[in-house]
Amino acid sequence: MIKLIWCEDLNHGIAKNNQIPWKIDEELNHFHQTTTNHPIIMGYNTYLAMNKILANQANIVISKKHQRELKNKNELFLYSDLKKALIDFSIVDLFIIGGKKTIEQAIKYADQLVISKLNADYGCDLFVNLNYDDFSLVQTKEYDQFVVEYWERKPNTKKPEDLIEELNINLNDDFLNLSFKHFSGPFDLLLHLIKDKKMDIMALDLFELTNQYFAYINKHMINLDLVSDYLYMACELLRIKSDLSIPNFEDETKIDLNNDDERDRIVKRIIEYKRYSELLPSLQKMQLERFSLFAKEEDDWDVFKLTSNDLLEAPLPDYVNPKKLKKAMERVFEKLKIKTITEHKIVIEELSIEDVKNEILSIIKKLLNNQYDRFIDLEKIFEQIDPKKLNLRYFVTSFVCLLILVREQKIDLNQKNDDESISACLVDPTKIVNSQESIQEVIQRQQEDEKALKESIKQIQEERKQSFFKQREEYLKKKYGEYYVSREQYQKLTPEEKINIRINQRKIDEQEKLNKAKAQNLVDENNQIIDLKTKKPSAKQILYEADLIIKQLDDLINDQQEDYDSQAELEALHTDLIKLDDEQEQDLIKEE
């Protein structure tokens, strides 16, 4: 059963600055009494806020980002996914204690809620907002400073289907049902009760357990895998009880009856066993599927390595198309009724490319009588091959061999039309053109190609640059008209002429911006008129649009005023510069 337990203040707050802002001993005792001997699941921040490991229970931390940080904490169970932790610990009652994100994710899986509600506000900055529609309040318990509410899931509500199937634990009633004075049930349940300390191992009669175990294995129908696994667990229980029963006089402090290391070790092994038992059907299915497949052994790649007689970068002739060759060979094999392999298990001899290549070449020479001016169809070539050899492996190998023979210039392949079959002929050795390049020539040709490519790229970039400057110059001439000057001309101007040019160009820029704004306003107004014609506006819309028009008029007046102000400033600056030049000239005349 999955249970959620947390404490909240009057405003549903659960934490402040990632810490619990209250310290109420009575509420803390209630938490320990409720969760002791049960696994607890928490988020990373909750683990930091606790600042300790709770004893007598499995501490499970859910975190994706802090796996390395907590990896050496052997007393913790680390999970990156809440759902996986719920599945692994689904055989026992567990509690989820926080924080906010973990509680909100887990409530859809919860069977019971235990909420401690405080009577005061503690100024929290972290709150839980949950929907309790799927739960009903079944019990309340009042304390001095808080009230505990117990909620249970309504019978007509369901958990998410994906988790229900995985949490559906079916204990096999036929497998080793035990019966003792204080216990009756399967071995699975016994281990879980001892694991959760719901049953004292010292009160367990291991002799009676062993007798019942041997009585079970004496039956005819048993599962040896399950029997051996549970026998191992029984031996572990026997060892634990022996360690607790026999005192160690050499070191009296060595045996600690409250130590949970052994219990935690058994818990981990049970979880590990459960994982493998769940994976076993899938592994068996994969094993059966693998038996129905056959693998191709590794080829000898030495036959594909280049030798001194091989041509470097030798292309196939223009009239040879591997795709057409493949289609032609498929038609040949269809006629020979060799389409697919239907047997699942067959014994295959390793095919050598060299042997198949020599076989095909010898058949071609035999059919053509070593004549170089005759052609033979592929269909006739493969009719000479032993039918027992014709299968998919031989088809693929022969396809590669034909390409190799063409590359080695031993045969030629020709096809007049796409629908016709491909014909083969022998190549006259005296007419073979040796187009092989030396290594130095290949390297030199590659270097020249790289150099030509760089020069071509550089030339293209320069052309683009000149084209850009030319387009920019034409644009500026069209924009500024008589006030346009080139860079060279601008450097030759006097300061007064430069200022005059700048003032006029700024006026043109501002006028252009103003024209664009007016044009956009006209477009917007036309769009609004069209919208008004197609859709009757409400009174509220009319008032809103009137306010918008008034605001646009105000902005237009302000912009016009700014234009006047800027123009006045520029003219004043121009006047000051002229006065400054006049004063400098008068000073020079006086000095002379």
Swiss-Prot record:
PROSITE patterns: DHFR_2. Pfam families: DHFR_1, SMC_ScpA. Residues 156-592 are annotated as: ScpA. GO terms for biological process: cell division; chromosome segregation; tetrahydrofolate biosynthetic process. One of its GO terms (cellular component) is cytoplasm. One of its GO terms (molecular function) is dihydrofolate reductase activity. Participates in chromosomal partition during cell division. May act via the formation of a condensin-like complex containing Smc and ScpB that pull DNA away from mid-cell into both cell halves. This is Segregation and condensation protein A. It comes from Mycoplasmoides gallisepticum (strain R(low / passage 15 / clone 2)). The gene is scpA.
